[in-house]
């Protein structure tokens, strides 16, 4: 699947703790597209990215996603709703 990501999303994934080698390779091969990048992901890679981002989403006492982790929440939603996932 091809997943368009913003520069902020790309940078957040790159900076995530415990970034697996399989995703490092995906980021290294990402194609620039105007304001961001296109990630070319297999199903396994998309699942790994979804799991990594899910682990980095945090909520406040009201159950709302915290502003500093919203970028990960947006990626989870983009992957989960992608027609090729």
Regions found by a protein language model. Give the residues of each.
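Positively charged, low-complexity terminal tracts
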Residues: 1-85
